């Protein structure tokens, strides 16, 4: 992207699509006020808390209760900002990709999400803070898809094709 090449990216997994949507397809402006607003939100008992935090009674310990709630608040806040027209699509994907990237730094895992640790490790105890991913300047004509490659391949073309199929059973 930074070298000016046109890039076409596809991933069937939504989290990866979101990251690529920002890193490959995006050059959005974000204000300090938007980040301050999201980081100042009070915790909400949402999806992450209910499914990945011990305090919810789900039996999992992937995030502290506080960080899970904070992640949920920011995720809900992003939807509100988008639906109210306060951020556009490029800003939405930038902030959502930054949330996905940020929350991983606070995960109570040994590095993969196959299992959580019994005790809360030191990095997972830190208070969650949304940190922005870098903006990679470059060509604005890149394409990012979230589709089955078997269908997409008939609608796109390029000079080089790199496929990275799933390689494990998880």
Language model segments and positions:
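Short hydrophobic/aromatic-enriched beta-strand-loop microsegments
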Residues: 9-10, 164
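Structural motif
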Residues: 159-161
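Conserved acidic residues
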Residues: 148
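Conserved SAM-binding loop of SAM-dependent methyltransferases across substrates and taxa
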Residues: 1-5
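Class I S-adenosyl-L-methionine-dependent methyltransferase module
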Residues: 6, 12-137, 169-170
């Amino acid at each position: 992207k930074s070298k000016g090449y046109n890039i076409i990216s596809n991933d069937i997994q939504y989290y990866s699509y979101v990251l690529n949507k920002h890193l490959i397809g995006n050059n959005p402006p974000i204000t300090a006020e938007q980040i301050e607003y999201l980081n100042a939100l009070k915790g909400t008992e949402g999806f992450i808390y209910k499914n990945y935090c011990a305090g919810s009674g789900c039996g999992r310990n992937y995030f502290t209760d506080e960080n899970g709630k904070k992640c949920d608040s920011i995720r809900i806040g992003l939807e509100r900002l988008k639906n109210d027209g306060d951020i556009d699509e490029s800003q939405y994907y930038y902030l959502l990709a930054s949330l996905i990237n940020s929350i991983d730094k606070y995960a109570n895992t040994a590095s993969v999400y196959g299992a959580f640790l019994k005790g809360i490790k030191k990095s997972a105890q830190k208070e969650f803070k949304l940190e922005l991913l870098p903006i990679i300047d470059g060509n604005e004509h890149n394409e990012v898809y979230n589709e089955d490659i078997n269908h997409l391949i008939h609608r796109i073309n390029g000079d080089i094709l790199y496929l990275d199929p799933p390689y494990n059973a998880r």
